[in-house]
Each structure stands twice: as C-alpha cells, then as structure tokens.
Amino acid sequence: MDQPSGRSFMQVLCEKYSPENFPYRRGPGMGVHVPATPQGSPMKDRLNLPSVLVLNSCGITCAGDEREIAAFCAHVSELDLSDNKLQDWHEVSKIVSNVPQLEFLNLSSNPLSLSVLERTCAGSFSGVRKLVLNNSKASWETVHTILQELPDLEELFLCLNDYETVSCPSVCCHSLKLLHITDNNLQEWTEIRKLGVMFPSLDTLVLANNHVNAIEEPADSLARLFPNLRSISLHKSGLQSWEDIDKLNSFPKLEEVRLLGIPLLQPYTTEERRKLVVARLPSVSKLNGSVVTDGEREDSERFFIRYYVDVPQEEVPFRYHELITKYGKLEPLAEVDLRPQSSAKVEVHFNDQVEEVSIRLDQTVAELKRQLKTLVQLPTSSMLLYYFDHEAPFGPEEMKYSSRALHSFGIRDGDKIFVESKTK
C-alpha cells in the first residue's frame, strides 16, 4: 500500500527522545545517555530509551529503518502509537517485529481498517499480552487473525469500533482474561453470548455504553457461557427488567458489577437503587466501584423485605421469600420527621404572669425581644431573657447574645422563657 506523506516511527523517536528534548534521568532504562563519541557514529550511541515509549498523536505513517528500530528498542516493553496515521499493518509489523520484549501495544485511532491483516504480519505481535484497538474500526476478521497469532494475549480493548454484531472465530481464545468492548452498538444478547464462546477464561467484561436491552439466556446456560467471569460492567446499557439483574446471580464467580445509568433504575432514588440491587445480588462484593460491607448488605436486605412487604404476592420477587427465611417478616419502619422545627409554643414568664406565645425559631434573640416588648411592657434594652428546658437537669440559661439564633438553643414546645428587667 502506498504510504501517505507523513513521518516515520524512527524519525519521531529520534526527535522526541533526543538529548535536547529528553533530559537525562538516573536509573536503568531511563533518560538519555550522551557518551563522548566521534562525529558520525551510529545513532544508537546517542540515545538510551525508556522501556515505555509514548508516541501518540505524532503523525506517524510508516516504520522507518528497521535496523535502527532493533538497535534502539530491544528492551522496550510498552509502546503507545495511538492517534497516528498508520494505515498499513505491514508498517506496524515492521515496528513490532523489532521490539522483541513488547507486551503492551496501543494502536487506537489509527486508520488500520484500510488494510488487511495477514497472519504473517500478526505473527510479529506474538509476545503482546495487552492490545488496544479502540476506534481503529478493526474488523472481526482482523480480530480473529490477531487471536490466532497472539497465544499469550490477556487483555483486549475494542471500544468505539461501531460493532453491531459479534463474529466468532473457528477456534476460541483461552488466554484472554479482560475484554473492553464499550461504546459500540451491541443491542442483542445473542451477540453478547458469543463473547463467552470466544473467551471461555474471561474474568472481566466491560460492556458499558452499549444498548444491551435484556439478558435473554437461561440461568444454566449463563453459567456455562461465562464460567470464570468475576466482573461485568453494564453501565448505561438498556436493561429494563429486574429479571435481568437476578440473572447475574447465574455467573458462578461474579463478584463485581457496574449498573449505573440503566433505564430500570431511573424511577428509584439513589438509596433505593443501591439497596435493591445489593439485596438481589448476594455474591457481589463490589457494586459500582464501592465495596459492599457486611453491614450494608444486612441493611439492604432488611430494606428489601420492607420495600416489598405490601406488594401483592404474585408480584413479589423470589428473593423476597429467601430473605424472609433469613430474617423473618419485618414491620415497616416508623416514619420519623427529622426536619428541624420552624416554630415552638413556649411559656413566657414575667411579673408573676404566664402567657403562651408562638415564636419563630429562625429569628435571633434580639428579634425575640422585639416580639415580646409589647407583651412584657419593657424596652428591649432593659430586657433579660432566660431559657429553661423542662427536660434539662440544669437551671435556666441566659440568652445574652443578641445575634444568636433561637433554634441553636434546641427550643421545643412546652419550654419556658423568663423575662426580667435589668433595673430590678
């Protein structure tokens, strides 16, 4: 394939990691080594590259001199080539085949869908354990070729590739443990189940921002499809039924779930969402990134019982009966209004008289004095106020600070306020 005008991997490498742009840092495989050498010595005598190379967004279109790549990059283990202009797998192969220690490769946002990946090219990636192909529009045929030639691949990222379906290869990949396939257009469970067939050892499946609308699979079949799945993200999926949440219990090793932003949970409060999900998933120890403690689980399960206690029997979920067996039938919690009082009826004592007065608790002591001025026939400047809590073991408390708010005294109905004159 003809290469568009651009820059080579080696050109960018030498520019970015030149002595002028990459200051010396102590430590193995770090920084730049500049020995005293005669003019015209090989380039590899001028640079000592780090083991992690980040060359994203550099306009790279081709490999460059393969001998120089081999001389520079024998020790490199991680390579980020994302957001470049690589569109020929042969050029990628020329780079990777000369980086023998490479374990992590990021090719995101390169237009590689414009060429076919041949098995001979893919073979040069054989040591890679983590491969990122986000927004590369890599076809499933390309993915299958990669899976055939990368026997040690453990993590694969296929996000933003516009997949609407999943295509299974002829041979499954037993090495893969983590698959990120977020932000695609997968909607039907018939497509998602193929991932279980392709990757039987899968530990983590990230399906966020797809539109999977239901888990249409019998429980026993789910256990066979994903026997090792420990973590699943269905963040912003299209799930609309509690039955789909219950089916997550069919994954025999599932411990971690992400379920934010699904239509099913929209009508519920934040507290209800978490408690109802925790109660339905007894084996899940982490929900939406937060650990589920034993105390939270018990609170959630008790909440679940009370939530469904008045629901018709035909609508009660099966989990309700399991929890009734565990805790027994629970009475609804008493409703307690914890909002602070806005007013109180108090007894105002003055000149051997007692009057019941309703006072606003958001006002200050100075404002209360003005309210009482007419009643007690004293100017505010001559007024002394004492608050007496009828349940407190101590005597009256002088209300001496004019700017203090009445609610800070904890005034309640039935308490007493004594008014005296300073002239007494």
Swiss-Prot record:
Entry's localization field: Cytoplasm, Cytoskeleton
PANTHER family in the cross-refs: LEUCINE-RICH REPEAT-CONTAINING PROTEIN 51 (PTHR46545:SF1)
Boundaries of every LRRCT domain copy: 262-303
Chief location bin: cytoplasm
Keyword Transcription attached: no
InterPro entries per the UniProt record, alphabetical: LRR_dom_sf, TBCEL_Ubl, Ubiquitin-like_dom, Ubiquitin-like_domsf
Name of the protein this chain belongs to: Tubulin-specific chaperone cofactor E-like protein
Residue positions where Phosphoserine is found in the record: S18, S41
BP-aspect Gene Ontology terms: microtubule cytoskeleton organization; post-chaperonin tubulin folding pathway; tubulin complex assembly
UniProt cross-references to PROSITE patterns, sorted A to Z: UBIQUITIN_2 (PS50053)
GO MF, any single term: alpha-tubulin binding
The Ubiquitin-like domain, residue ranges: 334-424
Coiled-coil residues: 350-375
Cellular component terms (Gene Ontology): cytoplasm; cytoskeleton
Keyword terms, alphabetized: Coiled coil, Cytoplasm, Cytoskeleton, Leucine-rich repeat, Phosphoprotein, Repeat
Annotated function: Acts as a regulator of tubulin stability.
Phosphoprotein recorded as keyword: yes
CDD domains: Ubl_TBCEL
Repeat region (LRR), residues: 73-98, 99-123, 124-147, 150-172, 173-197, 199-224, 226-250
